[in-house]
Amino acid sequence: MIQFTDVVKTYQQGNNALNGATMQIEDGEFVFLIGPSGSGKSTIIKMITGELKPTSGTVHVNGYSLERIRKREIPYLRRTVGVVFQDFRLIDKMTVYENVAFAMRVVGAREREIRERVPYVLELVGLESKMDRHPNEMSGGEQQRLAIARALVNNPSTIIADEPTGNLDPERSFEIMALLQEINNLGTTVLVVTHDQNLVEIFNKRVITIDEGIVVNDSMEVEEDYEEDYYTDDYYGEEELTDAAE
């Protein structure tokens, strides 16, 4: 479970990134997090991964309390959270298999575990036939799938996807979201940070809207008053995405 209660985060310059943010995400939920640039979304992600602590308020992530967490416990917290970065952060000199295996070696997994787990995860994301390829030989959609595999390989209880469809065409975007839905169906909590209004509407999940460091809306749909401010221009054609959904 992820729980923020009256969370304030003040940076050294005196700017507040969060101003009393309160939200709770239960185990196994699929949630969209939306908001304009500078609203506090990145700060929330950094707190969930243990990179930042709150100035005041409480943050609980998968059994860990950020106010009381010890430095040596942070790596264990991070093992419960897999992050799919917007820029992928893949290692071009490594193969697909090696990119995913590297994420397991970093946390001390045994080679036997790696040989069993990596092929399973690559099959889950549809890259089992591309194990020997390098990231720079792959399409954007395939690179995104590889980034998801790497985030998933250590079996985290939570996946955070930061703008996972930002550089993809409508068809590839829908495929990536369908993959995240499949991962969620296996019991993993999924938090998707996005500006894509059409994806949010089509997948019809819980939406948490943040603005100026506070949660201003938390529901199964985006209130009309918020839509214009919190989304980019209509990047996807509604007809294209509807066809893909069918």
Residue spans of the language-model regions?
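Helix-to-loop junction immediately C-terminal to a conserved catalytic motif
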Residues: 49
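Short coil-to-helix segment of the ABC ATPase nucleotide-binding domain corresponding to the Q-loop/switch region
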Residues: 94-102
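A short, proline-enriched helix->beta-strand linker immediately N-terminal to the Walker B motif
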Residues: 153-157
